[in-house]
Regions:
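Conserved HGGG/HGGXW glycine-rich cap/lid loop of the alpha/beta-hydrolase fold
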Residues: 33-84
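Catalytic active-site module of serine/aspartate enzymes centered on a nucleophile-bearing elbow/loop
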Residues: 247-288
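Flexible "cap/lid" loop of the alpha/beta hydrolase fold
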Residues: 121-129, 135-171
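Active-site nucleophile elbow and catalytic-triad environment of alpha/beta-hydrolase enzymes
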Residues: 188-204
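Conserved loop-alpha-helix segment in the C-terminal half of the alpha/beta-hydrolase fold
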Residues: 64, 218-257, 265
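Short beta-strand/loop motif that positions the catalytic acidic residue
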Residues: 208, 214-216
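Conserved alpha/beta-hydrolase "nucleophile elbow" surrounding the catalytic nucleophile
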Residues: 52, 111, 115-120
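Active-site loop/oxyanion-hole signature of alpha/beta-hydrolase fold enzymes
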Residues: 40, 74-114
């Protein structure tokens, strides 16, 4: 979400958005693209999915932090970073399918998944369309329905233009990593079109059996009410301490946190993610 604002301030809030290929980077054929990815750490597999206009370096400290306990597979989406673009719209369904094909290509039968923003919605679609491939899913700054986005952002979407983005320093910096240095305008067109895609996944989310950790900032692009509604669709929101086990899915709200600040708070993210992946539940007076 919030592609435009991310593109303006990403370098300042996250760290170096562009760098040379890191050691261990590889490419694999996925649906006609050469997808760039990096593998780090050891343990159970965990796939990391970045947001729009982002790439592996611009995800900041979360990837190395997750790699302390997991075998992390971080990939770059269609037209992003070092991954090539193809003549195809960028949709959440397409991105989710790309991840499924990527998993087959690198020999991953099943993995846990962490996605941020666009990557979170792609992760939702992966779990919806390919549930057998996802163990546990963490979605940071996700939305399952267009009505759940903040009114101010929904009003801003019609104002987005390619020209607006081409005037940003980000447009020039894009060339430092891009598989096609001249491909930025085409990428922007596709991402603006993505903002206009209708989101209406309530029934699909409710049908999910995959455990999901919903993470949101308290000033995120989706309303707090929407994030709570997602948690309820996943079986959460009832009172504990009543003799019934807590649901497998969880909700975490990051205080004083805007959309673009979510991914910068590595320590807080890890404090939510690791207990969820380990299946650890705090114990109260009445055991759940």
């Amino acid at each position: 979400m919030l592609r435009f604002l991310i593109s303006i301030i990403l370098a300042a809030t996250v760290g170096p958005a562009f760098a040379d290929d890191m050691a261990g980077g590889s490419r694999v054929e996925v649906n006609g693209m050469k997808v760039y990815y990096e593998v780090s750490g050891g343990g159970d597999p965990l796939i990391v999915l970045h947001g729009a206009y982002m790439n592996i370096p611009s995800m900041g400290g979360i990837i190395p932090a997750l790699a302390e306990r997991h075998r992390v597979y971080a990939l770059e989406f269609q037209g992003h970073g070092r991954t090539t673009d193809i003549d195809r719209p960028i949709t959440y369904e397409n991105l989710g399918d790309d991840v499924a094909v990527f998993m087959d290509a690198v020999g991953l039968e099943k993995a846990d998944v962490f996605g941020y923003s666009m990557g979170a919605n792609a992760g939702l679609q992966l779990a919806i369309r390919h549930p057998e491939k996802v163990g546990r899913l963490i979605v940071a700054s996700a939305a399952y329905d267009i009505e759940g986005l903040q009114p101010a952002f929904r009003a801003f979407i019609p104002q987005l233009t390619v020209e607006m983005m081409l005037a940003m320093p980000f447009a020039e910096e894009y060339k430092q990593l891009a598989a096609d240095p001249n491909g930025f305008p085409a990428l922007v067109e596709k991402l603006i079109a993505l903002e206009h895609e209708p989101l209406a996944w309530e029934a699909d989310v409710k049908a999910l059996e995959t455990p999901v950790l919903v993470i949101t900032g308290d000033a995120d692009v989706a309303t707090l009410e929407h994030s709570v509604a997602m948690f309820r669709l996943l079986g959460g929101g009832d009172m504990g301490d009543m003799g019934q086990p807590l649901p497998a899915s969880r909700l975490a709200v990051m205080p004083a946190t805007s959309h673009t600040a979510v991914i910068t708070q590595t320590d807080m993210l890890i404090s939510f993610i690791e207990p969820f992946l380990a299946g650890e539940t705090p114990k109260g007076m009445f055991a759940q």
